[in-house]
């Protein structure tokens, strides 16, 4: 009887030891997968280096002929799996012939990407899509629809060089000289990347009226420094695609103002922008804040030889010119995917509703199936208006949000969409405007919460 009790006690001690080390190994595997996934899709080797480092820092060094092994698997461009096996010595079970015990644990981590904005395909703001990509010159007044590319809350009416009216309200605190970024997402097996810009130059004529389908404008025709010179910088993929400020520049090209233009221009070289085979990754197109005054609208499209068509979309935010055919447009807003379930979708729109006074105008935020979502909203407009959660149809009549932010919050609890369909998770925004059929505006969208998570 005593022998049985001693055997049971020995087994209990070793079982607890095995359980403790299993828990430790699981924590190490979780840390390794989370550390590795942030390197995808650009650097699988970097993912392995970081995963091995995380495992070691959690008590399981990965060395040649060591007790612990780590095997990585790339399940998707944002999913990283780690299998870890370790061997531990036993205590009392040695007497029963079990000198060591092997433990196996696995962990899969997912990096939740920033939401894709504005386009589900290889184009952004092209003819016939109801909107254009856009950017305003640095010395354009903020109320003209671009809070980030413009320095000025107001400008002077004097002739001479472009400048802000610092005697009134001062410079725009939201200004950023780097402007906007667009992603050109290239898949494995692609080659010969071609990036084209539709009407890259500001095209306006000297009587102040639009001279192209993009309806480009100036507001200070008497300035000696006027018009917009737009620059496009194509940046190479790197290991941190969502931290775009350290990417290596592939090429850059500037386009000064011209009188008329309605053509596609291949960026940087012809016939392709980047010749040869391409690794999977995210090329970036940067449009920095240009001199001097006015607005420039343009379209973007990308193509490759071999492999699927690239994806082109706004990163973090998009500054656009909505060009409505009739009194209603329903452009794509953002791709909200199943992994965003349980989080909050925050949508900020600046200067929405450049409509004629006393004409009906409203917007609706739509699920992929066309149903209106529920949202709450606040604004820094006159009156600092707000509304509790309810159907997200917001009246924008009489320029209600002129020169102001409209900030919406949308709860994604129990959210589902069909990711197997090309447009199955793409939300839209319906813009109804019975008066003036265009709007210069800027949209910012994000998913709140930790972008890293463990998945089964």
Each language-model region and where it sits:
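Short, charged, low-complexity patches
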Residues: 25-26, 104
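Alpha-helical hydrophobic helix detector
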Residues: 1-13, 27
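Short amphipathic secondary-structure patches
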Residues: 16-23, 31-91
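N-linked glycosylation sequons
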Residues: 104-456
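Short acidic-hydrophobic sequence patches enriched in Asp/Glu that either
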Residues: 28, 47, 99
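Small-polar (Ser/Thr/Gly)-enriched, low-hydrophobicity segments
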Residues: 78-116
């Amino acid at each position: 009887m005593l022998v049985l009790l001693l055997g049971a006690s020995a087994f209990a001690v070793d079982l607890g030891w095995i359980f403790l080390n299993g828990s430790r190994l699981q924590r190490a595997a979780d840390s390794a997968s989370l550390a590795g996934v942030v390197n995808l899709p650009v650097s699988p080797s970097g993912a392995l280096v970081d995963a091995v480092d995380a495992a070691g820092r959690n008590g399981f060094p990965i060395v040649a002929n060591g007790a612990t092994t780590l095997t990585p698997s790339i399940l998707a461009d944002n999913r990283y799996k780690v299998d870890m096996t370790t061997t531990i010595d036993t205590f009392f079970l040695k007497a029963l012939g079990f000198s060591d015990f092997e433990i196996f644990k696995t962990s899969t981590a997912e990096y939740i990407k920033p939401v894709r904005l504005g386009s589900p395909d290889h184009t952004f703001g092209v003819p016939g899509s109801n909107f254009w990509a856009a950017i305003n010159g640095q010395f354009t007044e903020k109320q003209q629809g671009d809070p980030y590319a413009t320095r000025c809350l107001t400008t002077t009416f004097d002739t001479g060089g472009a400048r802000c009216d610092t005697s009134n309200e001062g410079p725009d605190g939201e200004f950023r000289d780097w402007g906007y970024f667009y992603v050109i997402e290239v898949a494995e097996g692609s080659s010969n990347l071609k990036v084209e810009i539709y009407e890259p130059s500001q095209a306006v004529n000297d009587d102040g009226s639009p001279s192209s389908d993009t309806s480009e404008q100036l507001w200070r025709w008497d300035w000696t420094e006027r018009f917009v010179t737009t620059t496009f910088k194509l940046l190479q993929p790197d290991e941190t695609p969502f931290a775009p400020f350290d990417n290596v520049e592939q090429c850059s090209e500037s386009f000064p103002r011209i009188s008329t233009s309605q053509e596609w221009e291949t960026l940087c070289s012809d016939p392709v922008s980047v010749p040869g085979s391409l690794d999977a990754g995210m090329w970036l197109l940067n449009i920095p804040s240009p001199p001097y005054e006015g607005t420039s609208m343009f379209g973007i499209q990308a193509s490759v030889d071999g492999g699927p068509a690239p994806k082109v979309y706004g990163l973090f935010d998009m500054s656009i010119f909505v060009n409505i055919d009739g009194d209603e447009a329903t452009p794509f807003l953002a791709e909200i995917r199943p992994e965003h379930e349980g989080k909050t979708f925050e949508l900020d729109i600046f200067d929405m509703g450049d409509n004629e006074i006393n004409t009906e105008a409203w917007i609706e935020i739509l699920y992929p199936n066309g149903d209106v979502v529920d949202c709450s909203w606040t604004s820094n407009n006159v009156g600092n208006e707000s509304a509790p959660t309810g159907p997200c149809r917001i009246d924008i009549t009489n320029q209600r949000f002129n020169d102001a932010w409209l900030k919406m919050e949308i709860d994604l609890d129990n959210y589902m969409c069909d990711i197997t369909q090309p447009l199955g998770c793409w939300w839209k925004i319906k813009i109804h405007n019975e008066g003036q059929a265009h709007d210069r505006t800027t949209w910012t969208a994000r998913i709140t919460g930790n972008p890293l998570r463990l998945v089964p």
